[in-house]
Amino acid sequence: MSRIIWKGAITFGLVNIPVVLRPASRSQTLDLDLLDVRDMAPVGYQRINKSTGKPVDKEYIVKGYQYAKDEYVLLNEEDFRQANVEATQTVDIVSFVDAQSIPPYYFDTPYYLEPDKRGERGYALLHETMRRTGRAALALVVLRARQHLAAMLVHGDALVLNTMRFADEVLPISELRLPKATTGKPTGAHAREIEMATKLVEDMSEDWEPEQYRDSYRDDLMARIEEKIDSGKTHQLTPPAEEEEAPRQGAKVIDMVALLRQSLGQRGKEDKEDATPARRKAPARHAAARKQPAAKRAATPPAKRASTAAKTKRAPAKRESHAPAARKSSSTTRRKHAA
């Protein structure tokens, strides 16, 4: 089922029937792109200044109405806003006419009217009344910010809403050069011809079955496309320049994530080391001790601690912590000499 494009109500007199509107048609036209045969890149469109032949940026394009030769009235967004009709969310029935009296070329786009649960009774009442009287309802409805004239018709169990062209949008038939239908005139039809044509019409008459009629041009073209696909006669599309940048942008995002992850890991490592300074200091002393002979370890303990402090680049506050140990060592040496 097609999607709902509008919600509102049918109104006539004091009757209000809640309904939704669904498209009753769909386009089956093949979507073909324009390509440059040299590299199979898509071909875009540009807006060209007809005087200079140069492309025009969007910011410099305005809309204007030509009221005389080379004379224009410019229109801005405010002009269009003031011209827009208010969306009333109603299908306002203004009159009923004989359904057979509407010329088919007035019809434009068909829609299905479907009642919601609150409107089922009123919908059935309007449908049955129009069916019995053979009438069509003429209504006004606002769709996509534009007011439309519409004809509501009975079709099976449903009510169908056809948007219509206004009278000034339809060219008058009087402008055509048509033969007179008077029998016996050179431009008219003779009785014998009418009789034979009537017999031919009867022989060709059949029930209306729209499924048996198809767009043969579309079907043949689609069959040709499928043949080319099956035989491998396809071409790789060259992506536009802006699409080529997409992978590089993705790579930058991935690299940034990797850098952030490394930064978080380094930050966690530093936090862990700051929380356990004693454990970090001890391995440094042991490593220095393993590099020195046993005799030198006993002879110069202060120098080793100073070297260890230099390697680990301690803050001033932590370097000062070695001073008491050095003074204690000197004091112990003096006491030994005194003894």
UniProtKB/Swiss-Prot annotation:
Signal peptide: none annotated. SMART domains: Ku78. Residues 290-310 have a biased composition (Low complexity). It comes from the Bacteria. One of its GO terms (molecular function) is double-stranded DNA binding. Gene3D superfamilies: 2.40.290.10. Keywords: DNA damage, DNA recombination, DNA repair, DNA-binding. Residues 10-187 form the Ku domain. InterPro entries: Ku70/Ku80_beta-barrel_dom, Prok_Ku, SPOC-like_C_dom_sf. Residues 278-289 have a biased composition (Basic residues). GO terms for biological process: DNA recombination; double-strand break repair via nonhomologous end joining. Residues 230-251, 263-339 are annotated as: Disordered. It holds the Pfam family Ku. Residues 267-277 have a biased composition (Basic and acidic residues). Homodimer. Interacts with LigD. Belongs to the prokaryotic Ku family. With LigD forms a non-homologous end joining (NHEJ) DNA repair enzyme, which repairs dsDNA breaks with reduced fidelity. Binds linear dsDNA with 5'- and 3'- overhangs but not closed circular dsDNA nor ssDNA. Recruits and stimulates the ligase activity of LigD. This is Non-homologous end joining protein Ku.
